[in-house]
Amino acid sequence: SSAWQKIPFGSPVPYLKEIRALIAEKLPLLRSKTRTENLKEFYNIANPVIDNPEYQKLKKIKHHDKDIYTHNLSVAWISFLLAKRFGLRIGDVVRGALLHDFFFYDWRTFRDKDYILPHGFSHPVISYKNAVKVFGRLTPVEKDIIVKHMWPLTVVPPRYRESLLVTMVDKAVASREAFKAVMPKRKETKQK
């Protein structure tokens, strides 16, 4: 659990502390299968999505300190482990998590003229439309995960436990990435 204590969840936002505590509490239970077995099961679900040439384009789009591909994969992996532990729909969780940020632009510099609201409000719908265009029909749970992962910005809360799980994991992973993205800048200023 010491590795999880190093994750920078020192946020005043209560749900991040709760997620950290929950993950730290459940981590030993998540290791009931070997890492190799879990990875094999995860990639059996994930490969049809991540091997798609359109999906591979996400590797070139920056997201905090990484790229969208790596961010989505991190969210999907952690969500997969927690979904297994809580008996949730693993396939829906993995696919929904992989597709939750399925847009092809750098949100810091690009503004879509079709959307009035800022990226945080509009990209769930953009991601859903892209997912349907590339992968076809999605399950109701997958759709809910994608469209509502920015809750409470999306106003309507997630309908399924799977959606809420991915929403919370996404916030934790994105917070960690954002924190890591600014840390090198802080180190540079301290050294001067």
Predicted regions and their residues:
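Metal-dependent phosphohydrolase cores
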Residues: 1-192
